[in-house]
Amino acid sequence: MGLGLGVRAAPFTYAAHALAVAAAAMVLVWSIQFRGGLAIESTNKNLIFNVHPVLMLIGYVIIGGEAIMVYRVLPTSNHDTTKLIHLILHGIALVLGAVGIYFAFKNHNESGIANLYSLHSWIGIGTITLYGIQWIIGFVTFFFPGAAPNVKKGVLPWHVLFGLFVYILALANAELGFLEKLTFLESSGLDKYGTEAFLVNFTALVVVLFGASVVVAAIAPVRLEEPQGYDPIPEN
């Protein structure tokens, strides 16, 4: 999708990869060093909750972003192979996102905390639902059984547009999640200007930069001489 931005996709894919590594490292440091670690089962319910931000960021946001960029990262690869990688990465992101949401519910249920009372939780459920619908439609239309070429051609721009919308919604909700958790921690006595607070805020900023890089990489052309219009995914 070349939109006359005057820039190529490649620099933004490189930036996104670097920012993904940084964001993943930062959320792991936060969850393990500052929040005590991760656990599937524990008497310390906070350790169960810690699985949620790790899976949502690394599994849902980062892997989902890599899935979006795969046609830019591998522009000369066999189309069917690239399409399969795109499908698998989005499927992994969807599954890990769903598991991440499960651990948020598990923490709430075992801690006696109400579910689905915040805007973050509402948008989260809505986003994962839309992500699942998008994946199913993409699978049926472009992979198996596959629609007719003219149908693929008509669906493709909407598939891309809706996919970017859902991804941006997921990014926005991740920011809400960081804000909500940090607000809870600070209301419980966490130093507003302490190391952990700064780490959380900087992690959120890195996620914003990562998401912006992904979106620009998706809409910028692989080569500046590319014609305008969406063309990285053939209809066949």
Swiss-Prot record:
PROSITE patterns: CYTOCHROME_B561. Keywords: Electron transport, Heme, Iron, Membrane, Metal-binding, Oxidoreductase, Transmembrane, Transmembrane helix, Transport. It holds the Pfam family Cytochrom_B561. L-ascorbate binds at residues 67-75. Heme b 2 binds at residues 86, 159. It is a multi-pass membrane protein. Initial time lag in electron acceptance from ascorbate observed in acidic pH. Two-heme-containing cytochrome. Catalyzes ascorbate-dependent trans-membrane electron transfer by utilizing a concerted H(+)/e(-) transfer mechanism. This is Ascorbate-specific transmembrane electron transporter 1. It comes from Zea mays.
